[in-house]
UniProtKB/Swiss-Prot annotation:
Segments of this protein annotated with the region Disordered: 1-25, 333-353, 750-788, 844-927
Gene Ontology cellular component terms for the protein in this record: phagophore assembly site membrane; vacuolar membrane
Entry protein name: Autophagy-related protein 18h
SUPFAM superfamilies: WD40 repeat-like (SSF50978)
Length: 927
């Protein structure tokens, strides 16, 4: 009766027979109901207002924009010594390549409408090989992972956040095709088809790695022949509803100059990299039988308490996992896949759980030239979702599916001799943990990772569209930022310059073996967050704002250098936002607290600041709306005919013998030495190696103000009116070469930091770039003509002032190649024009006319990894440590594990069972 009375009171609000207590109990629910109604009304009004404001942010509707599935920044290599920074966008109906190298000329290279594209990657210019042309004449080449079975249509994905509203039936993608698109001929010159989903692609001048669900195929970068394959840990399924094979984060695979890193599917070896447990007491001894049972009782009590604590923790962990799994099942009570349903996972058995716990989070680093495993270690206790090398190829970044902490390791191979002619590696000492980057307490998938040129800055982009910026030292240590006192600019923050812990100055007669620094946990110094509501509110009041959020990032300066800047920038960052804009940010030092107090505390010399003061502000400078619209025409720019600074540049085209559109090479300019410094190496860093020093080759202008191909000589010229191209200095001391770090001091005594390199020592596979700069005032440092590299090209658009659409002339380029006998199916008819479909019966196509001598069953293990034949690199920006590294080429034949996706054929040898035979390949993956 009491419950009925309450119902009547709540429903009617009138009952004179209620008691005092009942009246009180009825008043509270009514009050709470009234408050909840007010909150619901207010929130509904705010939601509708914010929706209307967000809808009015752009003049054109979101329906006019093509839906983005993939976004990333990459480098379009125009020669061995130069490249351009480009933005790659994959859509539900094709892809787009934009030149973002210069802020004054952001244009489209390619805009093609085709099948849905879920992954894009530019292939670097392959290393030259005598007598083998391969696909070098077709470069630059773009790799596009597409789904041929699905046409363009509505797709729901959180990879890039560009999701259309109003669609209820999402399209599930399963991309199984890797297409090689030539930016010279604007055709697909090669196609790889697989039976299972392709999740990621990584490229280097040596190999092209294609990552499937639980297997990785590695192809030769020059001939695109299958070299080997490895089994990997199953790729975590992290996609949203309706998506299969699209949103897996950055991807658990990384390719460096010589090494391949991937998630292992096998546990660590019991004899290497692990400690064996020891018994506390001898067998058969108990506290009651031992004469000195007092100490044993205490010891057993301590051990029992440890086991009890471990059991409680294990029980709590199992309970947490059970509740989490229950909530996860409730959350995924729909068409979307859950994390527990990842391929290859086994649950419900104790043995399988134990085996999986030993495997999960393990990383393998493999030398893809000698095919030896040089390092194997456990980086996380959860499945790995992201692996990335720095520009040097020796720093490895790892992240798990939770993304709370990102680990940074330095890979240092330690060769060991097991017998005559046999060589292996000590996995326990082949890696050094340097940093743990703390992102946050909540879980998020890592979507993008990028390093600066000197590996001092790193940007981590999460699935929440937030960019986390960290500063670190390439050689570890907790001192990552320091205050530098300048006579003109005053105190400012700057990254700390450090040297390797294994090196010793040349003036030291005694070698000291220093241990590596301890691992340090670093916090973010700045963030770029997604704040759409603030952006909408600012637009309402008429305050101009920049688009927020970040989906992809790269450290690059596309805007001209500010001559009158109150605070000099530490670095520049380009980001792609969820709204389809590219925003240029600059990193500005921010000193916390009172400046005078900071100077007093640190003294006259530069010192370290506290953690609260180690902050960096990000300031937006400029933005561009680059997302493709539905009414934009397709673009196919002629890469060979591009000019740069009014000059034809022959180095922009790949050095091939059959190219008919090569331009006349530049005539040599007069080179002047602006400044020289002769200094005996004493262990300190030379002035010219500081990050503030830049080098610029000059091109004298003619009477009309344009640059000439040759200098006529005579007269005077103002320095401020001369266009100059800044040479981007790259490190050369961080290359992944074999080195025994414990015995290098014998050669260091006589050579020091800078010495003459051997002819077969590795050079940088990431050469410097030459980027256009505006006229400036000040001293310039011209460089030698042979080391200057090629100037970047820039498109000259014809813009319609009425429509605002940029159009370009499209010269017709015809490429003919003789058809030869080869193991591939070689047919010029299979080169696809735009809007053409690929033949369904052809598994792998090739239209570049590969010589018959390059068959698919030949493994090029004799290809040297030395990059000396790639031309001379740019000026070093740091002390040269290459003479400390001694390359050891292993002749050991590594037998690859037999995989399930490679086709079987009786003609293949046992050590060639992972090669593809003929031109018709079908890769499959079971499980």
């Amino acid at each position: 009766m009491k419950s009925n009375s309450k119902v009547n009171i709540n429903n009617n609000g009138d009952n004179h027979n209620q008691t005092k207590n009942n009246g009180t109990n009825g008043f509270l629910p009514n009050s709470l109901k009234f408050i909840s109604t007010c909150i619901r009304t207010a929130s509904s009004g705010v939601r509708s207002a914010s929706a209307s404001v967000a809808a009015s942010l752009s003049s054109d509707s979101h329906e006019l924009k093509d839906q983005v599935l993939w976004s990333s920044f990459d480098r379009l290599h125009t020669s061995e010594s130069s490249f351009k920074n480009v933005l790659l966008l994959g859509y539900t109906n094709g892809f787009q390549v934009l030149d973002i190298d210069d802020s004054n000329d952001v244009t489209e290279f390619v805009s093609r409408r085709d099948d849905p594209v879920t992954f894009l990657q530019m292939q670097p210019l392959p290393a030259k090989c005598d007598g083998v042309e391969g696909f070098r004449s077709s470069h630059p080449i773009l790799l596009a992972v597409a789904d041929e079975a699905k046409g363009s249509g509505p797709i729901v994905t959180s990879r890039d956040g560009s999701v259309r509203n109003g669609y209820e039936d999402p399209l599930a993608l399963s991309p199984t095709v890797v297409r090689f698109y030539s930016l010279r001929s604007h055709n697909y010159v090669h196609v790889l088809r697989f039976r299972s989903t392709v999740y990621m692609v990584r490229c280097s001048p040596r190999i092209v790695a294609v990552g499937l669900g639980s297997q990785i195929y590695c192809f030769d970068a020059l001939t695109l022949e299958n070299k080997f394959s490895v089994l990997s840990y199953p790729v975590p399924q992290l996609g949203n509803q309706g998506i299969s094979g699209v949103n897996v984060g950055y991807g658990p695979m990384a390719v460096g100059a010589r090494w391949l890193a991937y998630a292992s599917n096998s546990p660590l070896s019991s004899s290497i990299g692990r400690l064996s447990p020891q018994n506390v007491t001898p067998p058969g001894v108990s506290p009651s039988t031992s004469p000195n049972n007092g100490n044993l009782v205490a010891r057993y009590a301590m051990e029992s308490s440890k086991h009890l604590a471990a059991g409680l923790l294990n029980l709590g962990d199992k309970g947490y996992k059970t509740i989490s799994k229950y909530c996860q099942d409730l959350k995924h009570d729909g068409p979307g896949p859950s994390l527990s349903s990842s391929p290859g996972r086994k649950v419900g058995r104790v043995g399988s759980h134990s085996a999986e716990s030993d495997v999960v989070g393990t990383v393998i680093v493999k030398d893809f030239e000698s095919r030896a495993i040089i390092a194997q270690f456990r980086a996380h206790t959860s499945p790995i979702s992201a692996l990335c090398f720095d520009p040097s190829g020796t720093l490895l970044v790892t992240a798990s599916i939770h993304g709370n902490n990102i680990n940074v390791f330095r890979i240092m191979p330690t060769p060991t001799k097991n017998g005559p002619g046999a060589q292996s590696y000590d996995w326990s000492s082949s890696h050094v943990p340097l940093y743990k980057l703390h992102r946050g307490m909540t879980s998020a998938v890592i979507q993008d990772i990028c390093f600066s040129s000197y590996s001092q800055w790193i940007a981590i982009v999460s699935s929440k569209s937030t960019c986390h910026i960290y500063v670190l030292s390439p050689f570890g240590g907790e001192n990552v930022l320091e205050i530098r006192n300048s006579q003109f600019d005053g105190p400012t923050l700057a990254p700390t310059l450090s040297l390797p812990w294994w090196s010793s100055p040349s003036f030291m007669t005694t070698h000291f073996s220093y241990p590596p620094p301890a691992s340090v946990t670093l916090s973010v110094v700045s963030r770029i967050k997604c704040n759409n509501f603030f952006h909408a509110a600012s637009s309402v009041v008429g305050k101009p704002t920049f688009p927020s959020g970040c989906l992809a990032a790269v450290f690059h300066q596309s805007v001209p250098q500010e001559s009158q800047s109150s605070s000099p920038a530490l670095d520049y960052l380009l980001v792609y936002t969820p709204s389809g804009h590219v925003v240029q940010y600059k990193l500005i030092p921010s000193l916390g607290g009172d400046q005078a107090e900071s100077n007093t505390r640190n003294g006259a010399t530069s010192g370290l600041t506290s953690e609260e003061e180690l902050r960096v502000k990000v300031e937006p400078v400029q933005c561009w709306d680059v997302c493709r619209r539905a009414d934009w025409p397709e673009r196919e720019e002629n890469i060979c005919g591009l000019t740069y600074g009014g000059r034809k540049n022959a180095e922009l085209t790949v050095d091939t013998s059959d190219s008919e559109d090569q331009t006349k090479p530049l005539e040599k300019h007069h080179v002047y030495l602006a400044n020289a410094e002769v200094l005996i190496n004493s262990g300190r860093k030379p002035i010219w190696q500081n990050s503030e020093i830049s080098f610029y080759p000059m091109y004298p202008p003619d009477s009309d103000g344009k640059n000439l191909n040759s200098h006529q000589g005579g007269g005077e010229t103002e320095i401020g009116k001369v266009s100059a191209n800044e040479v981007d200095i790259r490190r050369k001391d961080l290359l992944p070469v074999y080195d025994n770090f414990h015995s290098v001091y014998t050669s260091m005594r006589n050579r020091g930091f800078s010495g003459e390199r051997d002819s077969d020592s590795s050079s940088s596979s990431d050469p410097g770039q030459v980027k256009e700069m505006h006229p400036f005032n000040g001293m310039v440092y011209p460089e030698d003509e042979e080391r200057r590299g090629s100037a970047h090209f820039a498109l000259t658009p014809n813009q319609n002032p009425h429509t605002g659409i940029v159009t370009f002339k499209q010269p017709v380029v015809s490429i003919s190649s003789a058809v030869k006998d080869t193991d591939y199916i070689d047919d010029d008819a299979h080169v696809l024009p735009k809007n053409a479909s690929l033949p369904a019966e052809t598994k792998i196509e090739n239209s570049s006319g590969i010589s018959g001598d390059s068959n698919v069953s030949s493994n090029r293990s004799d290809m040297s990894m030395n990059a000396a034949d790639e031309g001379e690199g740019p000026i070093d920006g740091s002390p040269n440590f290459e003479q400390f590294f001694e390359e050891v080429v292993s002749n050991e034949t590594v037998t690859e594990t037999e995989h399930k996706d490679a086709p079987s054929d009786g003609k293949l040898d046992d050590d060639e069972d992972d090669d593809m035979l003929g031109g018709v390949f079908a890769f499959s993956e079971e499980g």
